[in-house]
């Protein structure tokens, strides 16, 4: 009986005794920066708001979005996401930078040497890389470089991005272990490298066949000037769109890669929350990922307009 009473009290505390529609409205109210709350000291401490004006026993306030507390740990979801998100963003950024550094030059050289051995090699590798899921790449890299070749590479199969320094002036402080970023970034970047290589190659071959490129050749422009000044800026439009889309998609791929390497980021946090039915953490992670997708797509449109002057006109 005491357990039933405690369960009822907990349901009331979490608002689970209300109808589902009411729960949704209160959750949206908690998320909104401009919201309606009771002017009670406990509410002020909970929501950390700034009061605008009062409406009886209620007040309209400005506050940061309140993502509630974890069912499992009791900590604020915003604090948990605040520790996990930077690690995942760093991982996704490292993967997409690696993809750009490898994919764009490889696509350019493959297009300039069409039907050569380099072109065939680039097409074969990109097709193979695109067909491999991120978690398969992660397992293979962990097995080969983190296990079998560990003595030569010094890389770990499983390792957190941060840890305590064991020597030096920052002894005992939390520091970034950069070598633990390498394998997850490579595993996450395999498919973006493949798609960027294919898109760059196709776009460059299309641009190089345009009339204005033939005119540039007829005027005696050097091959380097023609490629880097005239062809490449126009060929980068679809590549920029792909990069922006893949950056957001890498957050989803990170869910699998982080668990393979025990990388304590957003993906690992979300998977653990799903396994433990920690709904507030799952909702917070989903909302953040959705916001990133929207923000990245807006940024892609801006970059597309900057690169392609025709769009600006």
Regions found by a protein language model. Name each.
Residues 5, 19, 23-26, 62, ...:
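Generic alpha-helical secondary structure signal
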Residues 142-146:
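Transmembrane alpha-helix termini and helix-breaking/packing motifs in multi-pass membrane transporters
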Residues 135-140:
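A gly/Pro-rich, aromatic-decorated transmembrane alpha-helix motif that marks the paired
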Residues 85-90, 94-118, 134, 147-150, ...:
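Alpha-helical transmembrane segments of integral membrane proteins
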Residues 1-29, 39-46, 149-174:
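Hydrophobic alpha-helical transmembrane segments of membrane transport/permease proteins
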Residues 16-101:
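An internal, D/E-rich "acidic patch" concept
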Residues 1-19, 78-83, 100, 109, ...:
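N-terminal signal-anchor/first transmembrane alpha helix
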